[in-house]
Amino acid sequence: MDVHGAAYATHGKGVTGIAALDIQQGVSLRDYSTMRLGGWAAYLAHVRSPAEVEEGIAWAEARHLPVIMVGGGSNIIWRDEGFAGLVLVNRIPGFELADQGGHLLLTVGAGENWDSVVARAVAAGASGIERLSLIPGTAGATPVQNVGAYGQEIADVLVSVDAYDRQERRFVRIPAAECAFGYRRSRFNQADRGRFFITALTLRLLREPPRAPFYPALGRYLEERGLTHPTVQQVRDAVIAIRRAKLPDPAHVANCGSFFRNPIIPAPQAAELLRRYPDMPHWPVPGGGVKLAAGWLIDRAGFRGVADPETGMGTWPAQALVVVNHRASSTADLLRFKQKVQDEVRRRFGVTLEQEPELLP
């Protein structure tokens, strides 16, 4: 770490090396995660084109430094040790909607704000991502964890991902069929974690009204308002209203959204739990497993709306699945609180909860 001592001591000072990039030295990473925790980056630069991504990588490699790329920071948590290399912050713009006759092709820059992408697509009459409204972060993050909500996920509409392949040292286009999508998983956060720096993605959307069946909470909301044949804009508005009612705004309350994945357990284990807890929410999934609601498990374990005095962390009163940073001073505090929740859920239900936000580096 001694080689980066000057970087950590000179916070915010620009360094030279690439004319096109403004590479900052010694930058707090708390501003690059909506949980607002973590250490310092030795170097950080905002990239606004694929060429700048390639330049940033070359700059770091020439100095034998590790390099990582992030988006809006809504699904990442930085370690207290920070990052002793170059952090590239994806700000690549772009929005192009092309009519293909029976469908629409939407190509967006990976640095675009995701909800702004959804809003523009919906305003153009396109359907397919309206239920993914108000999800924080950038477009480039959506295929990484196969973002999903209210019965839609990015894998349903993705055509391809454009990215810089650090292994092959060239730009590539990856078809959706080669992304290895699963529940909140893809090759980008599993087998090929860190290999691809996503620069753009192309989606296949429709000019059709949204189709039922709707996710239960969304369906009830629409039915209560007499919207039996809702427009795509009405579905977006409904999703926004539901999310705002139960989820904190990361701009005002430090959080990363859903902190734990909904666990999938074997059917016999689910049957035993249902015998003990008949009201437990559950859904069958392909392969014979059963998905449980992590928020319900956390709630029943006694962690809904808590404010832990030891760690400064807590959970959101309207949705126990959301871990919030009240006054934590370190990522270590967050990880201690996470362990408390996991231990109690495991003790009561025999179910292990997995963390959803990625711990970096």
UniProtKB/Swiss-Prot annotation:
HAMAP family: MurB
GO MF annotation terms: FAD binding; UDP-N-acetylmuramate dehydrogenase activity
E.C. code: 1.3.1.98
Similarity-based family: Belongs to the MurB family.
Signal sequence interval, chain numbering: none
Keywords: Cell cycle, Cell division, Cell shape, Cell wall biogenesis/degradation, Cytoplasm, FAD, Flavoprotein, NADP, Oxidoreductase, Peptidoglycan synthesis
Protein name, UniProt field: UDP-N-acetylenolpyruvoylglucosamine reductase 1
Function in brief: Cell wall formation.
Catalyses which reaction(s): UDP-N-acetyl-alpha-D-muramate + NADP(+) = UDP-N-acetyl-3-O-(1-carboxyvinyl)-alpha-D-glucosamine + NADPH + H(+)
Pathway recorded for this protein: Cell wall biogenesis; peptidoglycan biosynthesis
Subcellular localization: Cytoplasm
A single cellular component GO annotation: cytosol
Cofactor(s) it depends on: FAD
Name of encoding gene: murB1
